Amino acid sequence: MARLYLIRHGKPSATWGGNDDDPGLDETGQAQARAARDWLMALPAAERPTRVVSSPLRRCRETAEPTAQALGVDIEVDARVGEIPTPAALSLAERGPWLRKSFAGTWAEIEGDLDYDAWRREIAASLIGRGNTAVFSHYVATNAVVSELLGVPQVLAFRPDHASITVLETDGVTLTLVEKGREATTGVL
């Protein structure tokens, strides 16, 4: 079995409703990215990641950068581990209320342009072949994977904190949850 690490991005410099729809990390987020790197690099060699994958969004790429540099590898950008797709008809101002409503329900109940239950299965399936990999992603995408692996329909399986590291194992055929990452004490929205 190979280890896979699903890391939520560090604290961004802006939140929902701000002027920047793709913010980078603030100083706290940069420190969190370095702490994630240090944790990953302290693992035994057999468990340490050899690849780095990131969501296309800047906050994830910036969180991934210290780990990629320490490993001497390039960041592989993969949209499949990106942010939950917002329905096309929603404005930026409507996204927060849509997310809050989505968080309160199940994957099958999310209203939008696609089958969000299928979306969560696709994210988990995309990770099966990624052993020995650090994957830098988002709050909702991390919940998609965890809820799929636990077999629960709720959107919120847990509340991953910024730069928390969820540990998974894969044999190339199946994906297993080893340990959820550190949980946040504050809300996302």
Which residues make up each language-model segment?
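Conserved anionic group-binding/transfer micro-motifs
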Residues: 29-33, 116-119, 135
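Generic beta-sheet signal
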Residues: 4, 50, 129-140
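Active-site-proximal alpha-helix that buttresses catalytic centers in soluble enzyme cores
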Residues: 2-77, 105-109
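Acidic, low-complexity terminal tails and accessory targeting/binding regions
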Residues: 1, 73-77, 83-97, 129, ...
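Short glycine/proline- and acidic residue-enriched helix-loop micro-motifs
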Residues: 97-118
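Generic structural signal for well-ordered alpha-helical scaffold segments
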Residues: 34-41, 120-128
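Active-site signature of alpha/beta-hydrolase-fold catalytic machinery across serine-
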Residues: 66, 144, 148
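Short active-site segment of divalent metal-dependent hydrolases/proteases
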Residues: 12, 141-142
